Amino acid sequence: MKYLYLLSLFILAGGLTSCASFERYRILYNDRIEAGNVEEATRLIENKRFYKKDRNEVLRYLELGALARMQGDLAKSNEYLNKADLLIEDRRASIGSQGLAVVSNPRVLPYRTEYFENIAVHYLKSLNYLQLNDVSAARVEARRTNIRLQELNDAVPEKPLKYHDDVLGHITMGLSYEMNGEWNNAFIAYRNAAELFIQEGKVQPYMGVRIPEQLKCDLVRMADQLGFANDASRYRRLLSPRCKDDVGEGGSLVLFWENGQGPVKEENIIGFDVMRRGDRSQVRFVNNSMGMEYDFGEDIYNEYNGFAGINTVRLALPIFRPREYPLYRADIKYPGGIQRMEMLEDLNVVAEQSLRDRFGRELANALIRLAAKEAVEAGLRSIKTKKKDGDEDNDGDEEQKKSKDEDKDEEEDVEYDETLGLILGTTMSIVNAATERADIRSWQTLPAEIHYQRVPLKRGANEIRVTFYNRYNQRLEEHYLRINGGGRLQVRHVITPDSRVLQPAATQNQKPVQP
């Protein structure tokens, strides 16, 4: 069994550069995005070998989908995101890679999207479809946002997720119903979004975000429009909304602002003490400083021989580090007024909680993987070979046979050489150190924050001005949109990875709006 692992050492060598390649490309890629050079960033993803590898294919499509969105090609964006979605749904790691992961790490496997990345695929597609006036498709994607989260919750019911629902999914669903004139369904969607902020009759933040005033107003407006007097009264009393007229003769505009760049993954090392109960065939991994403890029973104990020879393990895990971004808030000026854009989703908080949720479910397997590698190393170090005696007389064979029975119960003094075990153990130690790296791959082009606001439109041409400020209230950027008010609800977005707006001049391939 020990030598089976040795065979893996040569295979693992090919995977050692994966993480370094990603770190190198990440720097190049982010520099281009921050400079607003989306076309060069796209070419980097399209041409680099790293993104062409099968295990990184889902990342390739996720990045290209987000980049196409930045360039205003929403149909192309959905084409890429659909391909990524299919890979997320259908791809399964090969049996060989699963076996290799026992002595390696997740980087040799096809990239597994984080929980929140699974969800982001759907709400970005939903926002794309809303701008393309494809209401039914937008609604499907919004529903899939919540279906996917429910599936993740149901997968391990004894360990429910704290990131168990997504506000943006309900908001996009409500907008799609509004655009189609389905007021009752829109009310339900807005109510579901608002209820995420209500716990035990009190209003409080959800995933680091306070309930937006606009959501309060949308909920009460829908209740009033449907004649749901009791609901309208309850939510006015509970939420205390401060509402302005947000529907004009020309309809209304809902503007989404995607600000900054999402968090990046980095490596973090956590140590665990290994404790055994041989009489009960139990092994326990303990980190007292973090209050973490994992117990394993007889099956694991016997399979890995109680992880003999190791007393501590150090596990490499990814953590999310938020990135700095210069823009802090934005005001939207429209004919007749001005409104502050409100945060709807903080992806820094969502990403961190999503990772914690996953670790709560998967850390035990990672500990077994690491302990198995170190147990192999300890086993290799124990290998000894019998020393050869160059002066031994071959004619003594007959005498040895003769005394075989006499020496049967006697312990024979034999000298052993530990050199081979030392070499093999050291080799395995080097490989363990090199391969025990956290998987720091992630979807780079997601924003750090998503804000939104609804404003009324007049009939005909509307000039909308969006002014962006830093945290010191200094104006850094202004952007103008020209919207034709035709009496309907319209959705648009602006994107600021850094301090520059990448909003396209026009949305492509829109379906005609039905009267």
What positions do the PLM features span?
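Bacterial Sec signal peptide processing site at the extreme N-terminus
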Residues: 15-38
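"A position-specific structural signal for the A-helix of alpha-solenoid helical repeats
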Residues: 27, 63, 67, 117-120, ...
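TPR-repeat structural position
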Residues: 38-39, 74, 135, 183
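Boundary/linker segments of alpha-helical solenoid repeat arrays
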Residues: 53-57, 88-98, 150-158, 194-233
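TPR/TPR-like (Sel1-like) alpha-helical repeat modules
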Residues: 79-89, 143-147, 181-202
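C-terminal soluble interaction/assembly domains
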Residues: 391-515
